[in-house]
């Protein structure tokens, strides 16, 4: 099951959990109210998983590839890790399925506070278009993920501030309706 919590404000390595003591856990329902969708799947059978195929069909996730994020597999690793950790949004949903390893997606809540979502093997998440977010590997420095898209992939990230985009405006309206 997904683990998520409000992050502490401590400086330091973003690959650490940044879980405050005492913790402030976040449940699936709270993530859903932010538009974040979550599934737990069997990553060992991703190539022939009927549950994954059902999700892809229902949500029109027609394109996919696999990325391995580690120093010896990802060209310009340090540069890419910094880029992934910059707060940004996309004009389309971001869909990731962790096939191996682990990492963190951080998303902003309605009050602009960071919620950290721990992602490990078998976790699949959809972040809605317009949500400010970022990603980092954890201290293991290894994540293998399936990237899914509706139609042709669009890789463009818009660093904050990016409130002028229609996708952001639609997301803010969505948040107001879930209040």
Swiss-Prot record:
Which residues does the record give as Fe(2+) binding sites? 88, 90, 94, 133
Q: How is the cofactor bound?
A: Binds either 1 Fe or Ni cation per monomer. Iron-binding promotes an acireductone dioxygenase reaction producing 2-keto-4-methylthiobutyrate, while nickel-binding promotes an acireductone dioxygenase reaction producing 3-(methylsulfanyl)propanoate.
- Give the membrane topology, semicolon-separated if more than one: Peripheral membrane protein
- The ranges of region (Disordered) come to 7-26
What keyword terms does UniProt attach to this protein? Amino-acid biosynthesis, Cell membrane, Cytoplasm, Dioxygenase, Iron, Membrane, Metal-binding, Methionine biosynthesis, Nickel, Nucleus, Oxidoreductase
Major subcellular location class: cytoplasm
Give the binding site residues for Ni(2+).
88, 90, 94, 133
Q: Look up the domain of life of the source.
A: Eukaryota
Q: Which family does it belong to?
A: Belongs to the acireductone dioxygenase (ARD) family.
Query: Could you tell me what this protein is called?
Result: Acireductone dioxygenase
Species: Homo sapiens (Human)
């Amino acid at each position: 099951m997904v683990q998520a919590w409000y992050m502490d404000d401590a400086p330091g390595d973003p690959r650490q959990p940044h879980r405050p003591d005492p913790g402030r856990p976040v449940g699936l329902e709270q993530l859903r109210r932010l538009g974040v969708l979550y599934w737990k799947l069997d990553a060992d059978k991703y190539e022939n998983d009927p549950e994954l195929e059902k999700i892809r069909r229902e949500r029109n996730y027609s394109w996919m590839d696999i990325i391995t994020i580690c120093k010896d597999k990802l060209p310009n690793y340090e540069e890419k890790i910094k880029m992934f950790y910059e707060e940004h949004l996309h004009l389309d949903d971001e869909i990731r399925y962790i096939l191996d390893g682990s990492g963190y997606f951080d998303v902003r809540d309605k009050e602009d506070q960071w919620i950290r979502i721990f992602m490990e093997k078998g976790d699949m998440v959809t972040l809605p278009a317009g949500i400010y977010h970022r990603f980092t590997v954890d201290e293991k420095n290894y994540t293998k993920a399936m990237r899914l898209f509706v139609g042709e992939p669009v890789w463009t990230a818009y660093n904050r501030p990016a409130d002028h985009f229609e996708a952001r405006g639609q997301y803010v309206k969505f948040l107001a309706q879930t209040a």
